[in-house]
Design a protein with these regions (language model features):
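N-terminal accessory segments
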Residues: 1-35, 60-68
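N-terminal glycine-rich flavin-associated loop
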Residues: 13, 36-68, 86, 90-135, ...
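Conserved PLP cofactor-binding pocket of PLP-dependent enzymes
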Residues: 71
Length: 177
């Protein structure tokens, strides 16, 4: 159980975010597992709306020596999104298709975009994002990048990394790369 001082500081941080932070028991229990058999109740769950929210979370975690656990849909079978720190769930608010360039065959998306929804959108332009995962109706682009997801036809279409031109990330010091 986190000390009261840390809970108060989390509430103060939440007021500075466009997104939200939840530290109630029910929310934390919901994020204690993914599709794996592993289970660990996190300190809190943050749902950022913006990159600035993520940067504020990073600074808070560094100051308090807490881990941040990035999460999208939680469909992985290996427990990557389970931990005792702050789960950073981008699946709630960071779900936009930002820009499509049909001529050059690329799209820019936020990490919470669901694979099937992405493919439904680009199919209207004769395009397809190659990795065919068994969880395509719920897996999200951020998790696919983090896991280098692949699928039944990877020998033909390749894995996620084979379809990336670039990735914009926020590093552990809060800088962007």
């Amino acid at each position: 159980m986190a000390d009261q001082h840390l809970i108060i500081e989390l509430k103060t941080l939440s007021e500075k975010l466009d997104g939200d932070i939840r530290s109630d028991s029910a929310s934390c229990i919901l994020y204690a597992t993914d599709a794996s058999p592993y289970r660990e109740i996190p300190l809190a769950v943050a749902r950022p709306r913006t990159n600035q929210d993520i940067k504020k979370l990073i600074l808070f975690a560094r100051e308090h020596k807490l881990s941040l656990i990035p999460r999208t849909a939680g469909t992985s079978l290996a427990g990557q999104v389970v931990g005792s720190g702050i789960v950073v769930d981008v699946s709630r608010y960071m779900t936009r298709l930002l820009e499509l360039n049909v001529e050059k065959h690329w799209i820019r998306v936020e990490p919470g975009v669901i694979l099937d929804e992405l493919n439904q959108f680009v199919a209207t332009h004769g395009l397809f994002f190659g990795p065919e995962t068994s969880t395509s109706s719920r897996c999200m682009m951020g998790g696919m990048v983090g896991n280098n997801s692949c699928g039944a036809h990877s020998i033909i279409y390749g894995s996620t990394r084979d379809h990336l031109i670039s990735v914009k990330v926020i590093l552990s010091d809060g800088s962007e790369a």
